Every structure is written in C-alpha cells, then in structure tokens.
Amino acid sequence: MQASIIEFLSDPKSYGPDVEKIDIITTHISHVFLVGRKAYKLKRALKLPYLDFSTLEDRRKACENEVKLNRRTAPMIYVGVEPVTSSPDGQLAIDGEGETVDWLVEMNRFEDGLLLSEYVQKNKLSNSLAENLAEEIFNFHSNENPMLNAGGAGAMAGIV
C-alpha cells in the first residue's frame, strides 16, 4: 500500500494545479516530499530494533510524537499531522474523505542553505554560531526533566 501512497505524494497534481515540481528526500525511515513552502514526511512502514512504524497506528503515534517534541524547539516549522485518505473509489488525498491509509507530518519548509551541515561544507560555521548553538542546546536540556527510568548510559550503548 505504501508504494501507491509514495507514487501519489510524488505527483505534483496531488497538491493542486499550481504545483509543478516536488523534491523528495529519502532516508532509512522516511520519505520527505518538498512541495513549495511545505514539506510532508511519510514514515516508512518498517520495524527496526530501535523503532516500530510497522502499523498504521504506530505511524500515527510516531507522527504525533514528532510534532509534539519538535514544536518545543521549532514551532514555526511543525504544523501538524495529516491523514492520507482513500475514497471508496480508491482515490488518495491528503486529509480527504474516506479511510485513513497513512499519516504525514506536515511542516513549513525552512530556506535552502540553512542546514548546519551546509554551513560546515561551505566553511561558514563561525565560532560564535557554534557557541550560540551549544548554549541553546544546553539551555534546552537544562530545562528538561531527567528520565530516571530510561536506562542511562547502558541504554545508549545498546542504541549506539
């Protein structure tokens, strides 16, 4: 089923008459469809030792958790979770009528060239930017409650 959803999301006509081009970023766990100023992320239906997106419900929960967690640091990017639906005649739509067949994270895109990796590649990562970023990360983590039952360093060793 995901193959037909990926085909649908890869088609500019799926987003309306004004969309001419879609860029697609594929990772080991997701497909991200860049559409104008929007981005839609589809979690791959898979199960790995460290995550489980194998069912529709697993993917819905993962999308909701991603939005909830990432809105804390990027509320201007994370819009929400949208269903991919299939009408009785089999037509797919984003947030349309019919049965929900998958879930998407809807995001506002940020400007091209603003990835930290691109700053590094272009030798534009200044000391002040790195220090500001480190301070933001420190402040963020300082304000979070510790997860005392998560397994600590032993759990991290199992992941890494």
Question: Which residues fall in each region the model found?
Answer:
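Conserved ATP-binding subdomain of kinase catalytic cores across diverse folds
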Residues: 2-160
